Regions:
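Generic detection of long, well-ordered alpha-helical segments
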Residues: 129-132, 146, 150
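Short, well-structured alpha-helical segments
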Residues: 149-160
Length: 397
């Protein structure tokens, strides 16, 4: 977050993308395991930096009317990349998929060159750093109307007032703390509801439900992984096309409710002793859960988070959300086996159902509908002390 705030969104975004591509090449051509491991660590750092900078950058340069669509492009592209990697056999040198890998790398570096030549710096970061003329110039190039650009810059300058930034703003401003705690609560409960654990345990659940030896085969588990990622990709595409048209609140509420319903169904099915029927229903319910959870996570992580965090604390707040998300994922992966051994899948499903029910309640009572509202207006309403659910324009509760 410090790099994104100090060096700017553009440099961080391009630099992390270049670093990630370079580390990917090193991973493929690594001569030893130590080099391979180091390149994976570098790739992880680059991915985190790219995620942080790209989400902030997208929210700061796009118009309110298409901000959600543009923000959802990142998770959709991420899932598509994983799909290509999983469905393409052997990306190592000499493998069947190696030519495709080289083609994707060349496209990536071509996109980097275009980004270096054409991508402007975020006008919000320029205004926050004191480069007002440059911010106006960038806004004019983006909006093609000087009056709109000047009006937008006036709103940005209003949000730039104040000495507190980042962690200092978090410690001194109650309204900023409220929105950060809301976002962290949503992150915690979406992960506790099993968005990572349920696909991860898909094959184990099938093995427990059916006693066929086919379920122990690696190819079957791999097919389940492919199915899970494909469904998640469809969820990201659904979020992309609904988050601006229907708003943030409605897709998040519906997807959270579907998650809770499917988990409740899994709780009931887990007590069933009809193996074949249970296996079919469990598969359908898990697919529904992955789809709806993907919609929720895209609307939340890619769109809502950067919209509601104020400009002077955007990097800090976004970094906090991503950090808690990663830590919660690691804790869930670490502890889920102990939960299954102690409480069986029945206990796991029950815990996830409770978490999903709490997630529905938080979403209904606190999540605002921020589509068609500028991020400066959202910030002004936040600092004016308005209820969190009413931060968006024209929201009734």
């Amino acid at each position: 977050s410090g790099l994104c705030a100090g060096a700017g969104r553009r440099i961080t975004l391009i630099g992390s993308a270049a670093l990630g591509a370079a580390s990917s090449l090193v991973t493929v051509f690594s001569p030893s395991f130590s080099v391979y491991l180091c390149s994976l660590l570098v790739m992880g750092v680059a991915f985190s930096l790219y995620t942080l900078s790209s989400l902030i950058y997208t929210s700061e340069i796009t118009l309110p009317s298409n901000r959600g669509f543009c923000a959802c492009l990142l998770p959709a592209a991420f899932l598509l990349g994983i799909e290509i990697g999983i469905f393409t056999p052997n990306l190592r040198p000499g493998g069947e998929g190696f030519p495709l890998y080289l083609l994707l790398v060349m496209i990536h570096f071509l996109a980097l060159v275009i980004a270096i030549l054409k991508l402007p710096e975020s006008p919000r970061w320029l205004a926050l750093s004191g480069y007002y003329d440059a911010a106006l110039s960038v806004l004019f190039s983006l909006r093609n109307d000087m009056r709109i650009a000047a009006r937008e810059l006036a709103g940005v300058n209003e949000c730039c007032r104040g000495e507190e930034k980042g962690a200092e703003l978090f410690l001194q401003n109650t309204n900023f703390r409220k929105i950060v705690w809301l976002l962290l609560s949503l992150v915690l409960f979406i992960q506790l509801s099993g968005i990572v654990i349920l696909p991860y345990t898909f094959s184990d659940l099938m093995i427990k439900t059916s006693y066929s030896k086919d379920f122990y085969m690696f190819s079957y588990s791999y097919d389940l992984l492919k199915a899970s990622l494909t469904v998640a990709l469809f969820g990201a595409v659904t979020a992309m096309f609904t988050v601006d048209r229907c708003g943030r609140r409605i897709p998040m509420m519906i997807s959270a409710a579907v998650c809770a319903i499917t988990l409740f169904g899994l709780c009931l099915i887990s007590f069933s002793k009809i193996e074949i029927v249970s296996m079919a229903i469990i598969s359908i319910l898990i697919v529904m859960f992955i789809y709806s959870a993907s919609v929720f996570l895209c609307c939340f992580m890619a769109v809502l988070v950067c919209e509601v965090i104020p400009l002077r604390g955007r990097e800090f707040g976004m970094a906090m959300v991503l950090l808690v998300n990663y830590v919660t994922i690691l804790l869930c992966l670490q502890l889920f086996l102990s939960v299954i051994l102690t409480l069986d899948f029945k206990g796991l499903f029950f815990i996830e159902f409770i978490a999903a029910a709490v997630l529905c309640n938080i979403t209904y009572n606190f999540v605002p509908n921020t589509n068609d509202s500028s991020i400066e207006n959202i910030e002004n309403r936040l600092f004016a002390g308005r209820d969190l659910v009413n931060l968006g324009k024209g929201v009734k509760h």
